A protein has these predicted regions:
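Extreme N-terminal leader/targeting segments of oxidoreductases
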Residues: 1-23, 38-42
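Glycine-rich Rossmann-fold phosphate-binding loop(s) that bind the pyrophosphate
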Residues: 28-29, 51
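C-terminal accessory subdomains/tails of enzymes that are appended
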Residues: 15, 20, 24, 52, ...
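Glycine-rich FAD pyrophosphate-binding loop
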Residues: 40-60
Length: 570
């Protein structure tokens, strides 16, 4: 079994200081993780580092959708939509069928003829592009036209005057952070050295001015290290400019930072069997069924504060509530919200920054040379991470070497994907031994895929891990154990934010589960009593800061409230 553990991290750090790599990737979001896998799977000696936890930035704060971007059709971005739909098909069928699941949406229509025809053409093109991208295979159902009554049967809590009918179409959903962690683990399987919380502080250059490595610091120990590499790929998202500035060149990319927020609502609060796709005056709003919850968003506003911890403001939350309530009956209130989160989009910046048009900036990605030996990639979206990764590695290698060592990731299953169908079929039989009901088994299958037997083996070794968390019974104690032993969590907040997601999916942000989760983590990570108490204190401070930030009206005030809880170092 391939693991991200303390031992694996130490081994990777030792390799980083003792050998020269073909490719060094800076950035452990979905783009950087995808690049690390693409390079390693080509047989290139690869290393990947991130200054924070894996998926700590944008890649754990998305709408959790794998989609073609239906709205981009109306901007005539046919190439982008076709590319995204092709990648959606690959994720659903080959790359990560355990993590990516088809999801129906209703598009409510307000005018009986013109809008239905207009929307039907758009969704019809969407379906056609999807069928072309999947080479004729039907990976999701095609659109259906619904009467008002038919739409309200699927979504009973929509206002009667909010529609005259609807179009039902399909996209897909994914646990974004889990996808990133699985990409990193799969890259390690194919030989990559990977270490989170390693901050690059300098780009090294040889006598010809070519990038040849980096200086970095291990934020867990304070140790400095030098990593040598023939090629460096900057995949740091909203930190693109700061990272390329370390090289001191004139090349590189400019990105526009845009904030998007989501609110999380209990599943029972909205009675429906499908999601909603709503067009707004600036963009779109999704109401997405997600496990025991609804995720509703997003917004699109310029962000000028610190990049590490974007937070929703009270105005952001009101915006989402107001737009959702234009169609929901009964309307949502602040009391219905159990969680919120905010992420930053790294959008390619036009020559002249015009913040009022941030929603018009293309999501298509660009790769460029920063200095010889170092390239940067930015733009794109989660769905097209694999294409971005392939393009970045091809660019870094150059045409001749890229042809000699082509990408293989289009048909490469991630860990947990191979044999997923068989394990899904056997899940009930496998779970009977532990007394797990159908909902629990579905949850486990969708998180671990064909690696589910490994989780069961952990429970066999320690039956107490087969019990649910007392304060968060949707998760087993074994899942917390696995987060530390297999999935790379180094701190308590890593577990709550990117592994069990209670930071955004519980009204107290997981506060009631802190003691139990910390106890399990301490046993795996070897914390003494002082470290255990420090970890709990750090996460409680983070909770308090995030809740305080939500009460602020402006980005500046919210950011100031959030940074009261300092980042973990060591």
């Amino acid at each position: 079994m391939t693991v991200l553990s303390q031992e694996q991290r130490a081994t990777s750090l030792e390799a980083m200081t003792s050998q020269k790599f073909d490719v060094l990737v800076i950035g452990g979001g979905v783009t950087g993780a995808g690049i690390a896998l693409d390079a390693a799977a080509r047989g290139l000696n690869t290393a990947v580092v991130d200054a924070q936890d894996w998926a700590a930035g944008t890649s754990s704060r998305s709408s959790r959708l794998v989609h073609g971007g239906l709205r981009y059709l109306y901007n005539l971005d046919f190439k982008l939509v076709a590319e995204a739909l092709r990648e959606r098909s690959r994720l659903l069928t080959t790359i990560a069928p355990h993590l990516v699941e088809a999801q129906p949406f209703l598009w409510p229509l307000k005018t009986p003829v013109i809008e239905r025809a207009y929307s039907a053409v758009g969704v019809g093109m969407y379906d056609a592009l999807a069928r072309i991208g999947s080479r004729g295979r039907k990976t999701v159902p095609i659109q259906r036209h619904l009467s008002k009554a038919g739409a309200m049967r699927r979504f009973p809590e929509i206002k009667r005057d909010a529609l005259v009918g609807a179009i039902e179409f399909y996209d897909a959903r994914v646990d974004d952070a889990r996808l990133v962690i699985t990409l990193i683990r799969t890259a390690v399987k194919y030989g990559a050295a990977a270490a989170s919380r390693v901050k690059v502080t300098e780009i090294l250059k040889d006598g010809r001015g070519r990038a040849c490595g980096v200086k970095a610091v291990d934020l867990e120990t304070g140790n400095e290290l030098t990593i040598e590499a023939d090629r460096i790929i900057n995949a740091t998202g909203v930190w693109t400019e700061q990272t390329q500035d370390l090289a001191g060149g004139t090349g590189g990319l400019k990105v526009l930072t845009s904030k998007g927020i989501h609110i999380v609502i209990p599943r029972e609060r909205i009675k429906a069997t499908t999601g909603l796709f709503l067009r707004t005056e600036k963009s779109v709003l999704f109401i997405i069924p997600w496990q025991h919850y609804w995720v509703i968003g997003t917004t699109d506003t310029a962000w000028h504060e610190q990049l590490e911890h974007p937070v929703p403001t009270s105005e952001d939350i009101d915006y989402v509530l107001d737009h959702a309530n234009e169609v929901l009956d009964p309307p949502l209130t602040r009391d219905d919200i159990i969680g919120t989160y905010a992420g930053l989009r790294p959008l390619l910046q036009p020559k002249v920054l015009d913040e009022s048009k941030s929603t018009k900036v293309s999501r298509e990605h660009t790769v460029t040379e920063v200095i010889p030996g170092m390239v940067a990639i930015a733009g794109g979206k989660l769905t097209t991470y694999r294409v971005m990764a392939e393009d970045a590695v091809n660019f870094a290698l150059g045409e001749s070497l890229a042809k000699a060592r082509p990408s293989v990731t289009a048909q490469l299953p991630l860990l947990g994907a191979e044999g997923f169908d068989a394990v899904e079929n056997q899940a009930h039989r496998l779970g009977v031994k532990y007394g797990f009901d159908a909902d629990r088994l579905q949850h486990l299958v969708r998180r671990y895929g064909s690696e589910l037997p490994d989780l069961f083996a952990t429970i066999d070794e320690d039956p107490s891990l087969g019990k649910p968390l007392e304060a968060a019974p949707q998760f087993l104690r074994a899942e917390v154990h696995r987060a530390c032993a297999v999935e790379g969590a180094l701190h308590l907040e890593d577990i709550f934010v990117a592994r069990v997601r209670l930071n955004s999916e519980a009204r107290d942000r997981g506060g009631a589960a802190i003691d139990e989760v910390a106890e399990i983590a301490a046993a795996v990570l070897g914390w003494d009593e002082a470290r255990l108490e420090q970890e709990k204190s750090n996460y409680r401070k983070r909770i308090a800061a995030e809740l305080a930030a939500e009460e602020q009206a402006t980005d500046a005030a919210a950011s100031a409230a959030r940074v009261v809880a300092e980042d973990i170092v060591g």
